[in-house]
Amino acid sequence: TGILLAFVCPPTTPVWMLIIGGFFSIVVVKQLYGGIGCNFVNPALVGRAMLLASYASAMTHWVGFGSKLPLVGSTADVVTSSTPMAVMKGIFSAETAEDALAAVNDLTSTFSISDMFIGRIGGSLGETSALALLLGFVYLLLRRVINWQIPVCYIGTVAVLTLISAPAGMSAVDFMLYNVFGGGLMLGAIFMATDYVTSPFTTKGKLFYGVFIGLITFLIRHFGSMNEGMSYAILLGNLMTPWFNAWGHQTPLGYKKPQKAAKGGKE
């Protein structure tokens, strides 16, 4: 939980703030509900949501790639930078076609797809390098720690929706790659949405769950006021997990539904 919380926070987040977030995630969200295996939502994402609501400025403060971070307690200046999702938000909030085209040019000139794939961009600790996240995905699959259904359905849903909603002046494939590689989508899909405790355990339930959180992420990114929707999409999916398990329940082969007894006690 502590590592995942650090992964979804900016590298300039103060240590004392991380301690507060870790306490809230582990003690309030996990231990008060019975400890390991008893929490019904992802503790790290709830901790991030709490920090974002309480310290919005610090949680949205980014540094550019290659910036020299100050040591603990230092007041050295850090060069601030935007993230791909923050720049992309200008495309959806544009009121005119000219503004949208200007936002597209700003996105493509500021960030390249190759930089986003390798990790030469600003962002939270665990979301900047799509390559590293893909390697982690392959490793977890080979070790049978996670299954493919949730990550593939989650990322695939966002990919399909962004392919069909690309703005004018930008290739649909490029727009899709910016959305897949940008933000915390891959981090959430691989390391957070697959949490055993808070995700469905039925095969069909995992498929429903992945599509659902992919849809919510797309809607928040494109129509909401926030730049990123991964955290809230997964938390909503966590709350829906019992229903996904029920919808994905498979009836055993040969099962016969018991017949009700006739009225009057006669069978």
Listing of model-derived features with the role each one plays in the protein:
Residues 40-44, 176-183, 206, 224-237:
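Loop-to-transmembrane alpha-helix initiation sites
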Residues 220-267:
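Cytosolic-side transmembrane-helix boundaries in multi-pass membrane proteins
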Residues 26-37, 133-144, 190-199:
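C-terminal ends of transmembrane helices
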Residues 37-133:
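Long hydrophobic alpha-helical segments that form multi-pass transmembrane helix bundles
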Residues 1-6, 18-21, 25, 29, ...:
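Alpha-helical transmembrane segments in multi-pass membrane proteins
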Residues 1-8, 45-58, 157-165, 183-191, ...:
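Small-residue-rich segments of transmembrane alpha-helices in multi-pass membrane proteins
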Residues 11-21, 116, 120-130, 173-185:
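Structural signature of hydrophobic alpha-helical transmembrane segments
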Residues 151-153, 160-203:
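A beta-strand-loop signature enriched in Asp, Gly, Thr, and Trp
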